[in-house]
A protein has these predicted regions:
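Switch/communication elements of ASCE P-loop NTPase nucleotide-binding domains
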Residues: 41, 55-190, 196
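A short linear hydrophobic-aromatic micro-motif
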Residues: 49-53
Length: 202
């Protein structure tokens, strides 16, 4: 039902300025939430440098101050860090309730270490449910490290009468985790390559 999806529940980052402003100019409890979020950003993504998010007055722009550096617009951050802020802000602000977040390929624009930190942030700092579509072997490997991670595969299968179209079947893929672990095989070894060898001179 398309009417269920609108700007209030599709997160793009466009409302970050107004939400920060609302919290920072609101009650002490709201300001404390932002302070705690800045601490977690620092801990997981900025090597414990002090982080301050500033909705700059009359500019409709969010600035960020990292450590003792001069503040600057978050649009000048790398794409990966911008995406981290977009993907973690709502999840953390609403962490006292339980929500479901549907995220398409969260690994885009991020290096492997940042993807893992993002997953650790979700697992350790929130109690939401997250549904990802991904091509990342690093996300698949998280199934070995946490029993809160489930891998499922969607397979397109024709119906008995091909004229009736097709169905999507869902298969859980992490039930053989113990067997794979005993063989020294990680999920990424099954679904994606762990490495690529480039051979010159052919």
């Amino acid at each position: 039902d398309k009417e269920k999806y609108n700007s209030s529940n599709i997160i793009t980052g466009e409302s970050l300025y107004h939400e920060l402003k609302e919290h920072l100019l609101g009650e002490p409890e709201q300001r404390e939430i932002i302070r705690k979020y800045e601490e977690k950003l620092s801990q997981y993504f900025f090597d414990n440098e002090t982080i301050t998010l500033i909705p700059k007055h009359d500019q409709d722009v969010v600035n960020i101050k990292i450590g003792s550096d001069k503040q600057f617009p978050i649009s000048e951050l790398g794409d990966g860090l911008q995406q981290v802020i977009i993907l973690t802000y709502e999840a953390f602000i609403k962490k006292d309730e339980t929500h479901a977040f549907f995220i398409e390929e969260p690994e885009l624009h991020m290096h492997a270490g940042m993807v893992r930190q993002l997953m650790n942030f979700y697992l350790n700092e929130t109690k939401n449910y997250y549904f990802f579509t991904t091509h990342s072997n690093h996300l698949l490997d998280m199934a070995d490290e946490s029993d809160q991670v489930i891998i499922q595969k969607f397979v397109k299968q024709p119906k008995e009468n091909p004229k009736d179209g097709f169905d999507f079947k869902i298969y859980r893929c992490d039930r053989d985790r113990d067997l794979l672990a005993s063989l020294g095989v990680k999920p990424s070894s099954v679904y994606l390559a762990n490495c690529t060898i480039w051979v010159e001179g052919i």
